[in-house]
Amino acid sequence: MSCVSQSAGSLPPLCQWSGLEPICKIPPSQQFQQIHCPLITKHRSSKLCDLLPPGVTDSIYDFLANLPIILLFVASVPARFIYCIVYNFLLNFDQFILGIEYSIINPILDFFTAPLVYLAVGLTDGENNSAFSPPYLIGVLTDACLPGIVSGIYQAIGDIFYTIGYGIGFILGLFIDLYDIILYSICTLVTFGLTFGLCLSYDIVGIFKGAGGLKFTIYPFSFLAGLLQNYINCGCVLGSYPTAYIILCLNFGGSCPSCCPCGVGFTPPACPAIPNGTPPSPVNLSVTGQGCVSEYPHSENGSGGSGGSGSGSGSGGSGSGGNSGSGGSGSGSSGSGGNSGSGNNG
């Protein structure tokens, strides 16, 4: 003997829901990498840029011996001055650019952009109810680039905008949670199924033995599920239908089949009331005579059995998904076929 399942009412397959879906919060922001000031390259000088030639002032004898060269150096000061300007500008151009970038350009850019970054970081932290922790200087600015007082001003401005963003995000997170819980509660109510069952097993001296059961499932608000099917995507909200079961088992030397979970229990939906990640998206597979098959990453819900097909041109209907599937039957022009299937929550 096997388990016989009957139901009062039916629910749409998970993949046939459409409409409002739960809102997932923005993931908490990661702390920004602090880009420190670059190492300034070593300054390169030219001996022609010195006022006097090197090594001529060590003694009076060196000075007198090199007097013509010294006079030439003094006479060529104007020309060497122009040479040194060009030399330092060309060979030390990287220092010149870095000085402009990190002392003028970047502070100005960060002054206008950093407050918005602080606001965005505070928004995500507040929305996820994370710890209130304003980050340090964001962008290319650190205390190695600017004087301490300037860095303090930038940090104070960032703290203000972080606080504003945190407050807005916290209030927004409460509304998102309320919205998700309302959708979750509505979908749980309209798709809830209650199963009553009786299972019997017997084994008399190994001669007379058998096991079987009867289950009857009620969907009290299945009519509401049909009304809301195109307005709330309960397949995405729940991931699987919630069910409760009350099954009585009578054992006379045997054991009840696995299709009859003896006792009282409740199987909640696969998805949480407040989603902590991307909601599962159903994958619709077109199958002839069967409609669609729903596959959820977190779904443990079984699928209903498919209807049989006759030997003629007619084909059977498809079983319904949910807690239990009802078998369809089909008839051909010269024959008939029937089949039944049931889906159980894992």
UniProtKB/Swiss-Prot annotation:
Region of interest called Disordered, as start-end residue ranges on this chain: 294-346
Protein name per the record: Putative transmembrane protein ORF346
Compositional bias annotation for Gly residues: 302-346
UniProt topology in membrane: Multi-pass membrane protein
Cystines in this chain: none
Localisation: Host membrane
Coiled coil feature spans: none
Keywords: Host membrane, Membrane, Transmembrane, Transmembrane helix
Transmembrane segments: 67-87, 104-124, 134-154, 156-176, 181-201, 219-241
Record carries keyword Membrane: yes
One cellular component (GO) term of this entry: membrane
Main location: host cell
